């Protein structure tokens, strides 16, 4: 948090004087015993705040981490969170929101901030919705305008072509698909924007839990396709927001 923002939060009563002194005295991170070293300086250093990977964390650790952000009135996103984990956090911090399908907890103090640019999130099938939601919620949390285009896979390519003019207006496109994952390549052949491809684990046996989709996207014959890890909607959205932010700044 920069000093100007800190002063404004003190004046508005969002944080106490003691909490402000703690922020001024810290080294950019907060050591929570044996649990975590929270990187509060990450937003200043990288442009976006730290994220919490919830899946492998015990309840006590997860609550302590979210509580540290809450006490500073800092926004944070938690990925791969179960409904039970959300309920545990919600008991302590009432301000958190949750998407059960997207498996994301958000503590967002910047909901009303103006969004910038435009990211198109294009997913092949309804089964890809959890990954699509993870990407959508993350991108909105990180400050981007987002438009979603769902169930427009190549098995019914007319559905994609019907939306292609809208998709072309975006600064960057996230393409999400399982099975043979042809969507990213088809899109790349139709637009002049960079594409971040997300292979999903959706598919029958030879899909190999998303490996087939991953290799298909990596081997795309169309230029301009970069690929993130299997089911990694968060990672795709983060990268897309970095690019979107640069484009939005350049257009001013």
PLM ranges: what are they?
Residues 60-62, 128-133, 157, 177-187, ...:
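Short glycine/serine/threonine-rich phosphate/pyrophosphate-binding segments
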Residues 123, 127, 165-168, 172, ...:
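C-terminal binding/interaction regions
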Residues 116-156:
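Glycine-rich phosphate/diphosphate-binding loop of Rossmann-like nucleotide-binding domains
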Residues 162-200:
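Glycine-rich phosphate-binding loop
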Residues 1-82, 86-87, 91-92, 96:
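Long amphipathic alpha-helical segments
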């Amino acid at each position: 948090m920069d000093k100007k923002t800190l002063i404004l939060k003190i004046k508005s009563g969002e944080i106490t004087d003691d909490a402000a002194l703690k922020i001024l005295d810290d080294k950019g991170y907060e050591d929570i015993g044996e649990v975590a070293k929270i990187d509060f300086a990450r937003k200043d250093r990288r442009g976006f705040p730290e994220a919490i990977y919830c899946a492998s964390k015990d309840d006590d650790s997860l609550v302590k981490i979210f509580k540290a952000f809450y006490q500073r009135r800092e926004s944070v996103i938690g990925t791969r969170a179960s409904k039970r984990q959300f309920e545990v956090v919600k008991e302590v911090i009432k301000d958190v929101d949750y998407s059960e399908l997207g498996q994301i907890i958000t503590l967002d103090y910047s909901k009303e901030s103006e969004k910038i640019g435009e990211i198109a999130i294009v997913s092949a099938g309804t089964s890809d919705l959890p990954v699509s939601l993870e990407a959508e919620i993350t991108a909105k949390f990180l400050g981007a305008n987002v438009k979603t285009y769902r169930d427009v896979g190549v098995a019914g390519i007319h559905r994609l072509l019907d939306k292609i003019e809208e998709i072309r207006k975006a600064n960057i496109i996230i393409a999400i698909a399982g099975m043979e994952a042809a969507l990213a390549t088809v899109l790349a052949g139709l637009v002049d924007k960079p594409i971040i491809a997300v292979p999903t684990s959706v598919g029958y046996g030879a899909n190999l839990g998303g490996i087939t989709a991953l290799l298909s996207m990596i081997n795309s014959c169309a230029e301009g396709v970069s690929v993130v890890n299997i089911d990694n909607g968060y990672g795709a959205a983060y990268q897309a927001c970095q690019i979107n932010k640069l484009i939005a700044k350049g257009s001013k």
